[in-house]
A protein has these predicted regions:
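Non-globular, low-confidence helical/coil segments that flank catalytic cores
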Residues: 1-168
Length: 168
């Protein structure tokens, strides 16, 4: 009798509004940012084993249940496994319009469709919601022996409800 309630995807936010969902991926981070017409994943959580990661065990089932059939963007803040472990499963499981990261040039994620490095000053608007990349600076990519956390893609998201700072 209650099964139909479980099969209905939640309504999308109105124009200008944002829904942020922080997913429980254990140690690590994964955030779904949803506007009226767009979906972005910020970090993809950890890899648990060679065959299991937060992408195939948590994010893909969640996104399918939420009615998301494609991602407009996928941002990996830095190369630590607790932030990037589920990314390749996401890319295999859903169409992704573009990707961004601060990954080193030899990282496989850099081969993803429409990949671009995160750079301070990048900005875009989706459905009245403003997204602004605040870090890293272009010169940060040239620093030798940089620490991964110091390269984190920092994203500010502003909507009618207020702003959120995602630091990775």
């Amino acid at each position: 009798l209650m099964l139909p309630l479980l099969l209905v995807a939640p309504a999308r936010p109105a124009p200008g509004e944002l829904r942020l969902t922080v997913l429980d991926v254990g140690q690590g981070l994964a955030v779904h940012a949803q506007t009226a017409l767009h979906d972005l994943i910020y970090d993809s959580g950890p890899q648990f084993s060679p065959d299991a990661n937060s992408g195939n065990r948590i994010l893909l089932p969640y996104l399918r249940a939420a009615g998301v059939r494609r991602l407009d963007g996928l941002i990996l803040t830095h190369e630590d496994k607790d932030h990037a472990g589920g990314a390749l499963s996401l890319l295999d499981g859903l169409p992704v319009a573009w990707t961004a990261s601060s990954m080193p040039e030899d990282h496989p994620f850099r081969e993803a469709p429409g990949h671009r490095p995160c750079i301070d000053g990048q900005a875009w608007d989706w459905d009245g919601v403003r997204f602004e990349m605040l870090h890293p600076q272009p010169a940060d990519y040239d620093k030798p022996a940089r620490k991964t956390n110091d390269m984190s893609c920092v994203l500010k998201v502003s909507a009618v409800q207020g702003s959120a700072l995602l630091t990775g």
